[in-house]
């Protein structure tokens, strides 16, 4: 959620920055300003009436002592009470409307981001070189099938399109990747948190995914008197609610968390021909990084998260690039995002395996997550997140980049202690 004080003081700047994200917010900003003015007027009117009520309540005993008729004053007080109740009801309506409009606005992009979408994304750096084969390479679907790593057919039989089964060395390779990610993060000082996979609506609201993207997740059928729950689309949705409605101290920050979870997404729309196999699916495994920081720490925290993700991919020996996203390609909740994109040879391009983002205080305002400074004042923390990493594109890249002419796959050195072999073969 944006800062309403900032909107009121800088409406034109807010409009211009939201326009960089492709959002024409003229109507919403006008609504916010009008509703805020009405809200302040209603509060002032209520306070004026209450002041008059207090004055009259002090007069009544004096008038009674003087033997004067106080019935007119009681009648007036009753009318004032009715008016106050009427104003309070209107104030509740205005507050609800104002909150609804505020929740619908995306985050402001950082000033240095280019406007527009993917066409304006900026590659910042490359690592390694694209793999060149002296034989006809296979794609990851054929490799995983031939080696018995992934069972696509039975995955579809069990759950439909967009699902797969890890088998044998495929399951062990997947588990090796996850262990490598988790162990590296723990070594970097992050706390491992295993969160519920079913979350309440407030988690999606705090993360900024709801209400706009509420239909992109899988909702559970619940009884009318039960709390509504959904399957988490990413551990970020849970981790950024860990400190919802809490006030932390400066000494508490930064808080650094990681969590391994399966992620569940509807992935509406048709799949492109090059996205077959594991590249897009309804369920995949991911390790997520989240930090809570002081505002002045968040730029350094962002650089740290990007480096963490890059180093994981470097450790696997892959060719990849880091891309600074243009404003419109950043998600609604984020002020800036860098993607780490890995090369998958059969797809003739790069696929994102990590998005690292800074939400600034946008999520903290939605979830009332604050820090009490040493001087006693409170302010909103900053929240950041990043994939560290998702496996559903790492594994395809691994088998394609590390394949050999005989159809076997070389296991990256960092994974060998987890999987126990150097080469995966039939």
Please provide the spans of the model-predicted regions.
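TRNA-recognition modules of translation machinery and tRNA-sensing kinases, especially anticodon-binding
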Residues: 126-426
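N-terminal alpha-helical targeting/anchoring segments
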Residues: 1-131, 145, 149
């Amino acid at each position: 959620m944006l800062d309403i004080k900032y909107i009121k003081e800088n409406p034109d700047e807010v409009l211009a920055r939201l326009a960089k994200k492709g959002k024409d917010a003229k109507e919403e900003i006008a609504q916010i300003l009008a509703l805020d003015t009405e809200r302040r007027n209603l509060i002032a009117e209520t306070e004026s009436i209450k002041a008059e009520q207090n004055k009259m309540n002090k007069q009544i005993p004096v008038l009674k002592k003087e033997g004067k008729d106080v019935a007119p004053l009681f009648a007036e007080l009753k009318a004032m009470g009715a008016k106050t109740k009427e104003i309070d009801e209107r104030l509740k309506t205005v507050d609800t409307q104002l909150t609804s409009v505020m929740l619908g606005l995306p985050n402001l992009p950082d000033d240095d981001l280019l406007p527009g979408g993917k066409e304006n994304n900026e590659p910042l750096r490359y690592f390694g070189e694209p793999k060149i084969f002296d034989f006809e390479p296979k794609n990851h679907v054929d490799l995983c099938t031939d080696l018995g790593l992934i069972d696509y057919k039975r995955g579809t039989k069990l759950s439909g399109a967009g699902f797969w089964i890890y088998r044998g060395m495929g399951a062990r390779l997947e588990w090796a990747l996850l262990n490598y990610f988790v162990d590296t993060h723990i070594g970097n000082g992050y706390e491992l948190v295993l969160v519920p996979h079913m979350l309440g609506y407030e988690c999606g609201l705090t993360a900024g995914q709801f209400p706009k993207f509420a239909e992109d997740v899988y909702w559970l059928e619940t009884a009318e008197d039960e709390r509504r729950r959904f399957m988490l689309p990413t551990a970020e949705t849970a981790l950024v609610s860990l400190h919802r409605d809490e006030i932390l101290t400066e000494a508490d920050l930064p808080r650094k968390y990681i969590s391994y979870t399966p992620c569940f997404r509807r992935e509406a729309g048709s799949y492109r021909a090059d996205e077959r196999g594991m590249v897009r699916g309804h369920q995949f495994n991911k390790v997520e990084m989240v930090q809570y920081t002081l505002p002045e720490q968040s730029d350094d925290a962002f650089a740290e998260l990007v480096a963490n993700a890059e180093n994981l991919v470097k450790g696997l020996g892959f060719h990849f690039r880091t891309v600074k996203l243009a404003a419109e390609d950043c998600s609604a909740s984020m002020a800036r995002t860098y993607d780490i994109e890995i090369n998958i040879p059969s797809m003739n391009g790069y696929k994102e395996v990590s998005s690292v983002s800074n939400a600034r205080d946008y999520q903290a305002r939605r979830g009332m997550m604050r820090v009490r400074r040493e001087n006693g004042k409170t302010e909103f923390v900053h929240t950041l997140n990043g994939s560290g990493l998702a496996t559903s594109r790492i594994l395809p890249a691994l088998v394609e980049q590390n394949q050999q002419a005989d159809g076997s796959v070389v296991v990256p050195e960092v994974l060998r202690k987890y999987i126990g072999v150097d080469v995966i073969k039939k």
